[in-house]
């Protein structure tokens, strides 16, 4: 494949690259990306792009051809645009979310998702679920698209009210005329997912009993719904992973019967029998056909390499040719045409950062479409290298170290940046936050501490009961390792994190003292009992997997366990000896804003240095450009004041 670079003119145009004599402006990293998603239409003739000007979002439809004309656009302004997908050649489905408390519902504000159909021929848009009686106009996840007798249909999971009780329900929506039909009501137990066949029939239900912690799989055969699998899963539903390889089977992740540390992918036939997909214990993500109708491959993280496996040999060879066209870069499939011959890929260059490219397998050509971050140049991208070290108890910890560009990697100031979750993980992909900090002269360590996902179930379980304990010292063990290597100056280290990473930052100031000069928590839990109690209230006192999950990870026997206070930064505020920065969005529905106000009050009462920055109208995920940049600017100012890079 020959690669040619070409600009991509959009309504919100790609900013030309600029060479910065000094560090790039923080806005290069902190504002919303130039492009958040690129989807190619089924016939490959058009592109649907979710673009931004750094704050406002817009859907732009353009012809795929170089210099192709504008086909349509929708301005979403400050609305949080979450996903874009084609439904044939004339319809684009857009998913958005907002933080709200609908009229008539009790409880705290929550994040609600809505889906729209944009007709690129008529230029009209329509809210899915808009006119359905006895149902909310929200969706519980992205729609599935199927064609029935040439007509595009959207299949969405919605909420149908029966006697004032909301019940998850599968709906079928005719995108040609808007007609909506309730396809499956889910039954008595909580049905949390469906698989839909290519011809638009429900194949399977995923069900989860929150009280008992039982997950079950129901498959629809000739005699109706039959429960074919039932598993105890106290920490949450196993769910469905889509349709299987033949388009009629269904997929679910299960613990391997022969090795409890492994999770494998089972493929269930309509008679309830199943096979285990070969090598699926190595899979991190699945690849379905462009229309979602069948499983065609998987993605595995092997070391730091993202490897694609396609079950069809020709498709596998085609992907190998795509990757070969971008030597030295990390290549990810973003979208592809129905015939799988035109692909949009995200190309993550360790030198230039991420960009989108269009690959035409028939023409054996590829061209760049647009950079992901406007104004980001080679001078603004720092080197990321994998590291590996032993924790104090001998457990191997992996992670990533970002080294500031142009600096000798010796005696550097360090920022420890633990990920959220905590059942999540960091990867070597471009990370705007760590790159921004590196651009200011800091080395940045992102460890995959125990409890992180992607390293086997035993590694996750190693984190149970280790909040503020071994999960915390896994971070400081990384500091000691880098200090021993001479890479960083152990007297110039701060810790910064969001969500669980925010908790880890506060625990670094209260529980694992003497390691850090300052700590910044963004939306971090601080009073763990209050945090879990607030989650439990959503279920009105009923047993539930959410409460069980948090108590398991925190190592508490129940909501009244006094050990929660010993690992809660709020209760340990008097031990703080370093400056603390707290940043929190007012619209956070995951870790409530009150968690940071409680911590600020406790620190002030103890006479400790603290600053609280409130992000107006911001959620847990830093979805807005202005407040995302406000967060980043506040963190950098705090670091430069308390841990100067020079």
What is each residue range found by the language model?
Residues 26, 35, 56, 81, ...:
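Short coil/loop residues immediately preceding or within conserved phosphate-binding loops
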Residues 375-491, 498-499, 533:
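Cap/lid segment of the alpha/beta-hydrolase catalytic domain
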Residues 40, 49, 86, 389, ...:
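Conserved hydrophobic/aromatic "anchor" residues
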Residues 3-5, 9, 19-343, 350-352, ...:
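Beta-propeller folds
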Residues 449-646:
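Active-site-proximal cap/loop segments of hydrolase catalytic domains
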Residues 192-195, 298, 307-407, 432-435, ...:
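Non-catalytic accessory segments flanking enzyme active sites
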Residues 259-263, 284-286, 303-305, 351-354, ...:
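Flexible loop/turn segments at secondary-structure boundaries
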């Amino acid at each position: 494949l020959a690669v040619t670079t070409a600009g991509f003119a959009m309504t919100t145009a790609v900013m030309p690259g600029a060479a910065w004599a000094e560090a790039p402006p923080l806005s290069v990293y902190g504002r919303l990306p130039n492009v958040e998603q690129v989807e190619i239409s089924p016939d490959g003739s058009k592109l649907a792009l979710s673009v931004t000007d750094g704050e406002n979002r817009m859907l732009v439809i353009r012809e795929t051809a170089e210099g192709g004309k504008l086909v349509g656009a929708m301005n979403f302004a400050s609305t949080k645009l979450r996903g874009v997908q084609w439904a044939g050649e004339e319809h684009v489905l857009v998913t958005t979310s907002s933080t709200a408390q609908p009229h008539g519902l009790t409880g705290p504000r929550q994040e609600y998702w809505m889906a729209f159909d944009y007709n690129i021929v008529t230029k009209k848009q329509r809210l899915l679920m808009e006119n359905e009686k006895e149902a909310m106009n929200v969706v519980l996840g992205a729609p599935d698209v199927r064609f029935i007798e040439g007509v595009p249909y959207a299949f969405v999971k919605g909420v149908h009210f029966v006697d004032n009780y909301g019940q998850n329900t599968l709906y079928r929506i005719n995108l040609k005329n808007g007609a909506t039909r309730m396809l499956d009501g889910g039954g008595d137990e909580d049905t949390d997912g469906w698989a839909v066949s290519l011809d638009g029939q429900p194949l399977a239900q995923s069900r989860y009993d929150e009280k008992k912690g039982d997950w079950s799989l129901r498959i629809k055969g000739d005699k109706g719904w039959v429960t074919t699998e039932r598993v105890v899963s106290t920490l949450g539903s196993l769910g469905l992973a889509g349709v299987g390889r033949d388009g009629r089977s269904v997929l679910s992740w299960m613990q391997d019967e022969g090795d409890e540390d492994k999770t494998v992918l089972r493929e269930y036939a309509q008679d309830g029998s199943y096979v285990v997909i070969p090598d699926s214990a190595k899979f991190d993500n699945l690849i379905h056909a462009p229309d979602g109708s069948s499983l065609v491959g998987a993605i595995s993280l092997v070391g730091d390499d993202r490897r694609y496996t396609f079950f069809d040999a020709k498709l596998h060879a085609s992907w190998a040719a795509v990757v070969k066209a971008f030597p030295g870069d990390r290549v990810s499939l973003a979208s592809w045409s129905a015939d799988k011959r035109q692909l949009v890929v995200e190309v993550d260059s360790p030198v230039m950062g991420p960009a989108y490219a269009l690959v035409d397998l028939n023409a054996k050509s590829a061209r760049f479409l647009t950079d992901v971050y406007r104004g980001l140049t080679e001078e603004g991208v720092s080197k990321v290298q994998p590291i590996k070290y032993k924790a104090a108890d001998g457990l191997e910890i992996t992670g990533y170290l970002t080294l500031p560009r142009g600096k000798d990697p010796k005696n550097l100031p360090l920022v420890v940046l633990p990920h959220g979750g905590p059942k999540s993980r960091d990867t070597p992909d471009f990370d705007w936050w760590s790159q921004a900090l590196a651009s200011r002269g800091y080395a940045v360590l992102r460890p995959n501490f125990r409890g992180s996902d992607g390293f086997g179930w035993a590694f996750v379980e190693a984190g149970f009961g280790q909040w503020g304990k071994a999960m915390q010292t896994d971070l400081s063990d990384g500091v000691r390792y880098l200090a021993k290597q001479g890479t960083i100056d152990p007297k110039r280290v701060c810790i910064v994190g969001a969500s669980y990473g925010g908790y880890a930052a506060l625990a670094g100031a209260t529980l694992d003292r003497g390691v850090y000069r300052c700590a910044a928590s963004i939306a971090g839990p601080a009073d763990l009992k209050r945090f879990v109690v607030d989650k439990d209230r959503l279920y009105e006192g009923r047993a539930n997997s959410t409460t069980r999950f948090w108590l398991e990870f925190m190592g508490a026997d129940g909501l009244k366990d006094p050990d929660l206070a010993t690992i809660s930064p709020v209760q340990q505020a008097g031990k703080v000896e370093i400056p603390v920065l707290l940043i929190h969005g007012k619209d956070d529905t995951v870790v409530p804003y009150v968690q940071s106000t409680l911590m600020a009050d406790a620190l002030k009462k103890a006479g400790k240095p603290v600053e609280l920055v409130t992000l107006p109208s911001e959620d847990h995920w830093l979805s807005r450009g202005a407040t995302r940049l406000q967060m980043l600017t506040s963190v950098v100012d705090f670091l430069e004041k308390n841990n100067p890079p020079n």
